[in-house]
Each structure stands twice: as structure tokens, then as C-alpha cells.
């Protein structure tokens, strides 16, 4: 539990940059969530079956949500939203779901338990969108996957996985932007490379525990990029939904609203293939050896390499 909440604190600070809220607020939300995990007994279990998308940051969860979100039966907010984190932040509820102040007040008055509150947030959103299925994307869903399955045992979890070398290279300078007084501005980030590797390994291992569940699926970012039609057919079959025509899939970006936020800055753009294999030019020989030592065997297990001779 200490490791989980420690990871959450780091992620909350990153979210603070993205959402433009103070670090103080981010830490407060972390402590509230931690207190709930420690003290809340399993009093409420939701029957809702949301589609939950997660994975190591910079692994393609935004692309996965964009492709899933164009399905006519699915309601999916364009901005990332963690189903059990930030759920009582008024600004986020308003900006992501379009809830009015009155609707938010009613939700908070009626539902004190976090899991119950989250369920009713999703129900209200589906009602407003006229849909029967909801999909939510946030990279850090993978960090709390155990808690999510505990309170939403019927959820379908889509774990997006990317070559750890590319993900680590991207994580090193993430986030590149931050929100200041409502404006998106450049942000200089230099995360330690070993931290980036550990983050990727941790996220992969969190998901591996659920491989035997029929409500969990792993999807490679590279497959989404190189073969979106067949990959999405596999995903929609997993979700029990009809597949979408290939031409509509490839034009997914045309269906997104022209509104940019830090979490979805790539929204509205076609599939970009050039970042696959970026590690070949980004990583030094020393960093390659570091990755082999820390995560090389996991890379082989995921079939990104046949051995450590790369």
C-alpha cells in the first residue's frame, strides 16, 4: 500500500501540471484517496461495466481511447479521467463531463462513498450522452487496477503496452506542457532515465497479474498504429461490440471535437508512425545497457526482442 500511494503522489504532481491545479490540491487529493483505501471496508460494489483504458504514460492510451470512442454505442470523454481519482473535483467534473454546478452538488449530496459516487458520475454522463456504455482513459488506471476490479468487478480493462525503450524515452521529457492561468505553456521536464524505466516495468507488472481474467486484455501500441483495423476488431470483440468499418477507423481524428487540453493534445491528428523505434536515436549506449539490466528480460517476454543482443 505504501508503494502504491507513493506512486500516486508522484502521479498527482504530474496531473497538477496537466490540470493547472495547485500541488497543494494534488497532495490533498492523494491523501484523501489514501485514507479511503486504508479505512473503507468493501461496503459498495458497483454492477456497472465501464470500459477502462490504462497503461504506462506515453504508451498510446490516448490513441486507444480515440479509436474506441468513435464507436456509436460508446460514450467517452475526450479528456482523460481516472475513475477513482479526482472524482470530486468540481472543475474537472465540469470540464470533462459538462456537468452543471447543480448536478455536481446533487451527486455529492446523495453519494458519500467514492465508488458509489464514481458509479453515479458515469451513469449521469451516459444518460446525458444517450449511450449505454462508457469508456474512460487515464494512464494511471493501471496503477490502481486492483482497486478498480475490487469496486468495479464487471469492468473491461484495456491495457495499452508500448515498447519500453520508446516509452522511457518519451517519459523522460513528459510533461512537455503545463497549464498556467488557463493557458497551455511549454514546460521543461527532465525525468531520470532509470525512473522512466522503473515506471514502465511497474505498470507492465501491475497488469500481468490480471492476464487470466476474461475482463482484461493487452493491446500493443505498435499494433494500433500499424494494423488499426484488425487490432480494433479484436478489441471490439473483447467488448462484445460490432466492429467499425476500416475507413471510419482511419478517419477517427475527424470525429474528435476541435478542443485541445494538455492530456489530449494529440487529439484531432491522424495516426503517427514515426515515433516507433525512436529509442534507436534517443538512447545512449550507457542507457541501452541500463535498460537491458533493468527491463531487458521483460522486453523479451513481451516479444519486442528475441534476446538482449540489440
Please provide the spans of the model-predicted regions.
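PAPS-dependent sulfotransferase catalytic core
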Residues: 1-118
Amino acid at each position: 500500500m505504501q508503494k502504491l500511494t507513493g506512486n500516486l503522489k508522484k502521479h498527482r504532481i504530474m496531473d497538477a501540471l496537466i490540470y493547472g491545479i495547485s500541488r497543494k490540491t494534488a497532495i490533498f487529493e492523494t491523501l484523501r484517496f489514501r485514507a479511503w483505501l486504508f479505512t473503507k471496508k468493501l461496503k459498495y460494489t458497483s454492477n456497472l461495466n465501464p470500459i477502462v483504458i490504462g497503461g504506462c504514460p506515453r504508451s498510446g492510451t490516448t490513441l486507444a481511447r480515440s479509436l474506441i470512442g468513435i464507436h456509436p454505442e460508446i460514450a467517452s470523454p475526450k479528456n482523460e479521467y481516472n475513475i477513482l481519482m479526482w472524482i470530486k473535483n468540481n472543475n474537472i467534473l465540469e470540464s470533462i463531463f459538462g456537468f452543471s454546478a447543480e448536478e455536481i452538488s446533487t451527486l455529492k449530496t446523495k453519494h458519500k462513498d467514492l465508488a458509489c459516487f464514481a458509479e453515479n458520475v458515469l451513469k449521469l454522463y451516459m444518460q446525458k450522452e444517450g449511450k449505454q456504455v462508457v469508456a474512460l482513459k487515464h494512464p494511471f488506471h493501471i496503477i490502481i487496477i486492483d482497486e478498480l476490479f475490487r469496486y468495479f468487478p464487471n469492468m473491461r480493462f484495456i491495457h495499452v503496452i508500448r515498447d519500453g525503450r520508446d516509452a522511457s524515452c518519451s517519459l523522460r521529457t513528459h510533461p512537455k506542457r503545463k497549464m498556467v492561468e488557463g493557458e497551455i505553456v511549454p514546460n521543461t521536464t527532465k525525468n531520470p532515465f532509470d525512473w522512466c524505466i522503473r515506471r514502465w516495468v511497474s505498470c507492465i507488472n501491475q497488469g500481468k497479474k490480471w492476464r487470466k481474467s476474461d475482463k482484461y486484455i493487452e493491446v500493443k501500441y505498435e499494433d494500433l498504429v500499424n494494423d488499426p483495423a484488425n487490432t480494433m476488431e479484436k478489441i471490439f470483440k473483447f467488448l462484445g461490440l460490432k466492429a467499425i468499418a476500416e475507413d471510419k477507423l482511419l478517419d477517427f481524428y475527424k470525429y474528435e471535437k476541435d478542443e485541445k487540453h494538455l492530456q489530449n493534445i494529440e487529439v484531432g491528428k491522424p495516426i503517427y508512425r514515426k515515433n516507433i523505434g525512436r529509442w534507436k536515436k534517443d538512447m545512449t549506449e550507457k542507457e541501452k545497457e541500463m535498460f537491458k539490466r533493468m527491463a531487458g528480460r521483460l522486453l523479451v517476454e513481451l516479444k519486442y526482442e528475441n534476446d538482449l543482443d540489440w
